[in-house]
Amino acid sequence: MATNSIKQNGHKNGSVELPELCIKKDPLNWGVAAETLKGSHLDEVKRMVAEYRKPVVKLGGESLTISQVAAIATHDSGVKVELSESARAGVKASSDWVMDSMSKGTDSYGVTTGFGATSHRRTKQGAALQKELIRFLNAGVFGSTKESGHTLPHQATRAAMLVRINTLLQGYSGIRFEILEVITKFLNNNVTPCLPLRGTITASGDLVPLSYIAGMLTGRPNSKAVGPDGQTLSAAEAFEFVGINSGFFELQPKEGLALVNGTAVGSGLASTVLFDTNILALLSEILSAIFAEVMQGKPEFTDHLTHKLKHHPGQIEAAAIMEHILDGSSYVKAAKKLHEQDPLQKPKQDRYALRTSPQWLGPQIEVIRYSTKSIEREIDSVNDNPLIDVSRNKALHGGNFQGTPIGVSMDNTRLAIASIGKLMFAQFSELVNDFYNNGLPSNLSGGRNPSLDYGFKGAEIAMASYCSELQFLANPVTNHVQSAEQHNQDVNSLGLISSRKTAEAVDILKLMSSTFLVALCQAIDLRHLEENLRNTVKNTVSQVAKRTLTTGVNGELHPSRFCEKDLLKVVDREYVFAYIDDPCSATYPLMQKLRQVLVEHALTNGENEKNASTSIFQKIVAFEEELKVLLPKEVDSARAALDSGSAGVPNRITECRSYPLYKFVREELGAEYLTGEKVRSPGEECDKVFTAICEGKIIDPILDCLEGWNGAPLPIC
């Protein structure tokens, strides 16, 4: 169908054929936009990861993705850029058209005219005009020291270079193909021009920062680049380093404008931000499921019918992912028995941070997915001005440089990130609070003496700090527009500013995710310790009960023998960490509740209590004294066995689908179980996880947790 359309109208500039831009059944592009959102978010993340790991990014102008931008931006794996040779003819055609129109005396914006509000000025010195354009746009400030922090991060610059090449390859901009080849050489040799961090409103594109790439290409004396080893290079040294011996470019008419008049810096940074955001969003769903496991939550909050009745796809998928993690979980099975045994031990319903986590995360996933597709459309767009339409022999004066999709998408993404962080903080706060966490110790303290172990108290304070800053960053950027450039640029997108703020938000969410994951691993190990200690206490109480309560002084069966079952119920129902640091203390609940059982049995013993040989009261002292001798030793032995890796009860996490993340933290990263008895601090362990998240090492463990999921909820039955 596309081929027939081409024959009918013949419109073709470069790599993008005009009929493809105007599909008859979808003239407004809504259908294409909707099509990109088909399938699950998990499948989309898997596709992103696969693309990110490919060794080559082939640019043709119309199929660049955010994952490819992220891959080139990091350069960690040595990914290379290749330009589609098929785009050369279209690029050359638009460049030739500009030169032809110049020779014919055609009046074209930015070619024979001034710029913006001063476009009423005229000149025939096209090359000199481009040189002046780059000079006056070099208005950024870097500061005199490396610590000044006024240079755009080099990853963002690399992303911008790639996106700008992709735009210019489409053949609507009037620039030579050779210039794009040189920018590609810079990328492939890891030589990155220095761009100012601030100074763009992303409305006539990212004029100021992009002018520094043009300055490097033209050899401006103030241009600097950074080499692969961090060395500072002048423009001449940069050209020599990448093997370009033909000298700097003398820009032809329109070429300077083609380089600077686009949204590549904002959309490039937005691409890297969204790649990370999609990974973190998926991680937040898994962390919510692990939170449900260690909190002994009720899994019915993931039931598909609940979410199907709400209709929102993000919510349905978030619930289905959590349902998959919890399905068959050993923690869930154990918690179910606990709830059946004592339904009044905790509230009938879990608190909102657990129970409504799919409803909370679902809309954020939807926002992130839509923003991802919006930015992918932007990085594959032609976004400068004027556009050269060779087929109709005209220059189109419009406003595709307006980066509103970037500003809006980044504002929305940042709000979604803040919401994810808010949920994470609420979950963390429940996890460390012994009033809410169903038997875990206060602050997740793992040591023997809680008076000398305050666990994650400092980490909770840090989480509050992270969350507060994240909520502040959620405020929109796009409502702070100022009229610029003599009121010509009177509305502007602030796309790069919003992207920068979203990059900050992503960094903070990484801090929160790493801290929360370390805390969850601590909680997993505490549940393991709890189970072993409870087992030890039960066995010890049972042994002591049999020795002291079964028979009387003459070997006859004693009425107190019937107390054992109720004594063991006390052990099952009492939170281990409420007494385990001093299990036989009279002020702790274990001894109080055990004595209460014996007293209650004694009160129902009737006339037998008057006889010393049948009195249960007479047995209490013997039971307690022997327990006080034996129990502390047994508890210490159980702790020692756990520390040496020979615990009597294995860690339930090994039977769970969430195990890959736990294994990654404990084994691959070496982040340890924390106690006040050790020197290691929480921050040191969180740092290991944070670094792994930043380096992308956590991606595989995340996907391993969801291996085998078919993309659908469990059937309703």
From Swiss-Prot:
Where mainly found?
Answer: cytoplasm
Q: Which location does the Swiss-Prot or TrEMBL entry give for the cross-link 5-imidazolinone (Ala-Gly)?
A: 203-205
UniProt-recorded name of the protein: Phenylalanine ammonia-lyase 1
Q: How does it assemble?
A: Homotetramer.
Q: Which family does it belong to?
A: Belongs to the PAL/histidase family.
What is an example of a Pfam family matching this protein?
A: Lyase_aromatic
Could you tell me the Gene Ontology terms of the biological process aspect for this record? cinnamic acid biosynthetic process; L-phenylalanine catabolic process
In the UniProt record, does the keyword Chaperone occur? no
One GO cellular-component annotation of the UniProt record comes to: cytoplasm
Q: Which NCBIfam families match?
A: phe_am_lyase (TIGR01226)
**Functional note:** This is a key enzyme of plant metabolism catalyzing the first reaction in the biosynthesis from L-phenylalanine of a wide variety of natural products based on the phenylpropane skeleton.
Where is the catalytic site?
109
Provide the binding site for (E)-cinnamate.
Answer: 261, 349, 355, 385, 457, 485, 488
Keyword terms = Cytoplasm, Lyase, Phenylalanine catabolism, Phenylpropanoid metabolism
The domain of life is Eukaryota
Report whether Zinc-finger shows up as a keyword of the record.
no
Q: In which pathway does it act?
A: Phenylpropanoid metabolism; trans-cinnamate biosynthesis; trans-cinnamate from L-phenylalanine: step 1/1
